[in-house]
UniProtKB/Swiss-Prot annotation:
CDD domains: RIO1_euk. The gene is RIO1. Residues 403-484 are annotated as: Interaction with CKA2. It comes from Saccharomyces cerevisiae (strain ATCC 204508 / S288c) (Baker's yeast). This is Serine/threonine-protein kinase RIO1. The keyword Disulfide bond does not apply. Transmembrane segments: none annotated.
Length: 484
């Protein structure tokens, strides 16, 4: 039989092939699409061109938001960039008519409205989304009650949207209070914030405080006192702490000091609000100290801001002029090196702002009626900590001598009297006039620390003289094991 006859005689089992086909069909049946073909929807594709950014802020998504504002008549046109920063760029624009602009039938484009100078001018703040420089925003949002359900730190677009809404709400709160001048907020859309433009004419922005040409020395004092008064009004009336107050975030417009850039501002209930307030006071003092005027101690300004009532103040607490006059005549000037040392201590203090930071004996004093308000109790505790730190820095040597004499006298007494005194001390309350001495290696004197370390080295050196060598110790251990 030839090879061709043998090939013709070969046959494939039909049952085996059907079984294989059924297995393949069962395996891939869920991937077979049986619905009708749809040619209307094109396949969506993500490309880098969708996030192409111009001037760090203008990407296609942001341009659509701006176009929608033009369509709704919020703004008429967008002009050049006024300023750039770590979180946003600010652009100039003219206000729209509030209606949709008319489209020219011949050209198919929007009709350009003539700017006669009578229309309002807007500042458009556009936050950076794709190219972020300022990423450490979590500490300004953490603990903020208003944004407890809208945190998204991992998605930059959602985070910036929350950040823009936060500034809009803070700016609106300050503007509606009427006690602190601020630009009027107009609208917010995602990462685009529209507000009033503070202009000195011909489209030029009013100068920031750092660029303002002071006329005389009295004007520097005036703006310094105004800034201190603003911190109090912001805390007491608007219930906010700026958290980035400086000469860069204030504008002089029509001889008034305007407050801007309140995106990072927090409420007094925020866990770090007092730390932010202390930072604002430091920044303001540093700037005006460079301007060559006398400044107030930081701790004095802090107490002035958080105190509900002021001693010897008979005016309106919401009146900026009355507060400025009170500041100029009542707050003490920082003049000595001791005041500078007190400021350094105050910056490093842990500020008590909640019940968790107080001791049990403090609540006993509150129960006894020695404090009318919990706020005064907390303020008193801060003052006591400050006095303790000050006493430790300046009178450390005197305290060591007195403590040494007390220990010597205690050793002479018998055990029974000592135990009685211990029981009495456990029940006694501390005296307010006696400062609380800070303990621990962190607050130890440098000379004592050096002496203690040297004594420890000498003790270890003496111990090593009588120490059994390691190889000898191993031999002895091995011998004892072999005997057993």
């Amino acid at each position: 039989m030839s090879l061709e006859d043998k090939f013709d005689s070969l046959s494939v089992s039909q049952g085996a092939s059907d079984h294989i086909n059924n297995q393949l069909l069962e395996k891939y049946s869920h991937k077979i699409k049986t619905d009708e073909l749809s040619f209307s929807r094109a396949k969506t594709s993500k490309d880098k061109a969708n996030r192409a950014t111009v001037e760090n802020v203008l990407d296609p998504r942001t341009m659509r938001f701006l176009k929608s504002m033009v369509t709704r008549g919020v703004i008429a046109d967008l002009n050049g960039c006024l300023s750039t920063g770590k979180e946003a760029n600010v652009y100039h624009a003219f206000a729209g008519t509030g209606k949709a602009p008319v489209i020219d039938e011949e050209t198919g484009q929007y009709e350009v409205l003539e700017t006669d100078g009578s229309r309002a001018e807007y500042a458009i703040k556009i936050y950076k989304t794709s190219i972020l420089v300022f990423k450490d925003r979590e500490r300004y949002v953490d603990g903020e009650f208003r944004f407890r359900n809208s945190r998204s730190q991992h998605n930059p677009r959602k985070m910036i949207k929350i950040w823009a809404e936060k500034e809009f709400r803070n700016l609106k709160r300050i503007y509606q209070s009427g006690v602190i001048p601020a630009p009027k907020p107009i609208e917010v859309k995602n990462n685009v914030l529209v507000m009033e433009f503070l202009s000195r004419g011909n489209g030029f922005a009013s100068p920031k405080l750092k660029d303002y040409p002071y006329k005389n020395r009295d004007e520097i004092f005036h703006y310094y006192h105004t800034m201190v008064a603003y911190m109090r009004l912001l805390y007491q009336v608007c219930r906010l702490v700026h958290a980035d107050l400086s000469e860069y975030n204030t504008i002089v417009h029509d001889d008034k000091l305007y407050m801007i850039d309140v995106s990072q501002s927090v409420e007094p209930e925020h866990p770090m609000s007092l730390d932010f307030l202390r930072m604002d006071i430091k920044n303001v003092n540093l700037y005006f100290e460079k301007m060559g005027i006398s400044i107030f101690p930081e701790r004095v300004i802090f107490q002035f801001v958080i105190s509900e009532t002021l001693e010897k103040f008979k005016g309106d607490y919401n009146n900026i002029s009355a507060l400025v006059a009170y500041i100029a005549s009542n707050l003490p000037i920082k003049s000595t090196e001791q005041d500078e040392a007190e400021d350094e201590i105050f910056r490093s203090l842990h500020l008590v702002r909640s019940l968790g930071g107080l001791e049990e004996r403090d609540f006993d004093r509150y129960t006894d009626g020695k404090f009318d308000l919990l706020k005064s109790l907390i303020a008193h505790d801060n003052e006591r900590n400050f006095a303790a730190s000050e006493q430790f820095e300046f009178d450390n040597a005197d305290h060591e001598c007195s403590s040494g004499t007390e220990e010597f006298s205690d050793d002479e007494e018998d055990g029974s009297s000592g135990s009685e005194e211990d029981d009495e001390e456990e029940g006694e309350y501390y005296d307010d006039d006696e400062p609380k001495v800070l303990k621990g290696k962190k607050h130890e004197d440098k000379d004592l620390k050096k002496l203690r370390k040297q004594e420890a080295k000498d003790a270890k050196r003496e111990k090593r003289k009588t120490k059994v060598k390691k190889h000898i110790k191993k031999k002895l251990v091995k011998k004892t094991k072999s005997k057993k």
